[in-house]
Amino acid sequence: MVPWLGPDDPFPPVERALGATSGAPGLLAASGDLLPSRLIDAYRRGIFPWYSDGQPVLWWSPDPRMVLRPAEFKVAPSLRKTLRRVLREDAWEIRVDHDFASVMRACAQAPRRGQRGTWITADVVEAYSSLHRVGDAHSIETWFEGKRVGGLYGVSFGKMFFGESMFAEVTDASKMALAALVGHLRRHEIEMIDCQQNTSHLASLGGREITRKSFIAHVRASVEAPPIPWRFDKTALLEVVAPAS
């Protein structure tokens, strides 16, 4: 049975999450609140919220866990060509934390195959914006000719980045933001991005599944490290692909 958490109740051990044979593998708990303090505690334990509008807040810790190691990020030839153009042309920019809430709202509006609606409601935007205001959540944004055309957002503690969602209004704009993030994380020797659940898109970029036990061990060690700086631009792409000579 999935426990209901009151405002002061702690999360149960992640090992108590529902198993693979259940109707909701990885579901750990439910609650009626999405307070910033609850979010911070969740991420530092390797737990994340995901639910549909009208449901209680559902908290998850799946096994296995999808992750992307920056060192294993795959750059297809077509994307490599695009990244070189981004580096070369002044019309392209990568901005960090320029308009965090707007990136979240754009992610909420992005169409998702097999999904109706979004869990990124106004309350969710406000909760994550609270983390952003204290430096624990960040947006990486792709801009072209002064207009934001793609991006992603996530949560960061110490040497761990927890990816949440991304969007693209032009081809590969979200991949440009991800590549810049990967470059920045490589510079600071970050070993893992949490991707939560397996998708073919993430796998094509180098994502792979690891056991929950391995994931939680890495999170516990990484979140206690000193925070990294969160100011960079498109030159972070140089860590991923050298510009054309």
Swiss-Prot record:
EC number, as in UniProt: 2.3.2.6
Compartmental location: Cytoplasm
Gene Ontology CC: cytoplasm
Keyword Membrane: no
GO MF term list: leucyl-tRNA--protein transferase activity
Major site of localization recorded for this protein: cytoplasm
InterPro entries: Acyl_CoA_acyltransferase, Leu/Phe-tRNA_Trfase, Leu/Phe-tRNA_Trfase_C, Leu/Phe-tRNA_Trfase_N
Pfam families in alphabetical order: Leu_Phe_trans
Family designation: Belongs to the L/F-transferase family.
Protein name per its UniProtKB record: Leucyl/phenylalanyl-tRNA--protein transferase
Species of provenance: Paraburkholderia phytofirmans (strain DSM 17436 / LMG 22146 / PsJN) (Burkholderia phytofirmans)
Taxonomic lineage: Bacteria, Pseudomonadati, Pseudomonadota, Betaproteobacteria, Burkholderiales
Gene field: aat
